[in-house]
């Protein structure tokens, strides 16, 4: 994404009523104008202003780097609490942060469909720029391509993030040990229900908004108190249940959860009951699961609750020895049930 091309455009982009056409992806004057007047204008920073096809930056000597990439195809593009733009920033920042890393830079790639309104694209790009600024993680390079009408769905966005892990931090999905505590940063299911309600034009007494948010500051606050956190994961597609099954399998352990301890907003619980969904399998975009030694659980929970994104944090269970790697849950009625892997796709195109 070159930031300094000046081609003497005859007229500015018609943002109000203009649309993407094939020329915007052809690499010529129209493409350069789109990049300059829409993308660079929103993402403006020292790397983009260099006008190169890549971003060059220094990294701390001896640093352990983390890289993550995430493709976003959410439908609808705009939903209560966010849009594909802010979601694409938050999602990749969170993937980097779940290694305990400080996110430093983002790259963004756009697949645009011919005929997509420039006004909607501008809204998405400005939302991305705002999310990146708020997180303090600049978008330093990128790319755009255009596909023919009918061969895309408006816009798809892929973001890639780079970060650095502080010395002494070792977080890994294989790190859970029997006796460890399982902590959750907040309520489950808002993002998935917000997407579904918008997609299906469902109305509830209280609007359900996506929880989409960047979690790296919360992670930094947690690690400042308990640097020995063993596992971090954000329960996105497949929800909490799928995430915990992944960790159990990676670590070779089992888990026992307490259903009464898992927070779900009443309106989300009601919506899930109406729609035949289980909140434990519904996607989140601004929550995390942490696993730590039981002796550190109280201190870590206090650190989480001291951050705006962790005020509703709870201790929800424990890690146990189990060669089957089952995730089980004590129900509110006193029984036990297996919380299995998600079978199939519960909510398609959720992120």
Swiss-Prot record:
S-cyanocysteine PTM positions: 351
Catalytic activity: C-terminal S-carboxamide-L-cysteinyl-[HypE protein] + ATP = C-terminal S-cyanate-L-cysteinyl-[HypE protein] + ADP + phosphate + H(+)
UniProt enzyme class: lyase
Catalytic activity, EC: 4.2.1.-
Name listed for the protein in its UniProt record: Carbamoyl dehydratase HypE
Pfam families: AIRS, AIRS_C
Biological processes, Gene Ontology terms: protein maturation
PTM description: Modified by HypF, which adds a carboxamido group to the thiolate of the C-terminal cysteine, yielding a protein-S-carboxamide. The carboxamido group is then dehydrated by HypE itself to yield a protein-thiocyanate.
Organism expressing this protein natively: Cupriavidus necator (strain ATCC 17699 / DSM 428 / KCTC 22496 / NCIMB 10442 / H16 / Stanier 337) (Ralstonia eutropha)
Similarity field: Belongs to the HypE family.
Taxonomic lineage from the root: Bacteria, Pseudomonadati, Pseudomonadota, Betaproteobacteria, Burkholderiales
Gene name, Swiss-Prot/TrEMBL: hypE
Entry superkingdom: Bacteria
Disulfide bonds: none
